[in-house]
């Protein structure tokens, strides 16, 4: 499993951001995303964590998905990191 963390700037309307993320989720799944979580990190910022089936899926699709998501929901990427999942605990 591979994970990406993306920092987004948005208009501060959390409910709208959630609905937009839900609407865009099917496109992310088509690109190989397995799970996505979002955390409000400030009045106008959200950080997403997305799990992917493979690093190859991320490398093939991440820039395209970030651009399309940003355009579709009016958010802009302010930062990001990625890496292989080292441990998963339930």
Residue ranges and their predicted role:
Residues 1-68, 74-90:
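Short S/T/G/P-rich N-terminal loop/turn motif that feeds into the first structured element of a domain
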């Amino acid at each position: 499993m591979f994970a990406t963390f993306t920092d987004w700037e948005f208009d501060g309307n959390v409910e709208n951001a959630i609905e937009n993320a839900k609407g865009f989720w099917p496109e992310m799944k088509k690109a190989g995303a397995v799970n996505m979580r979002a955390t409000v990190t400030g009045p106008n910022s959200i950080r997403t964590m997305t799990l992917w089936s493979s690093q190859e899926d991320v490398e093939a699709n991440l820039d395209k998905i970030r651009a399309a998501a940003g355009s579709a929901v009016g958010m802009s990427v302010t930062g990001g990191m990625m890496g292989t999942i080292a441990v998963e605990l339930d």
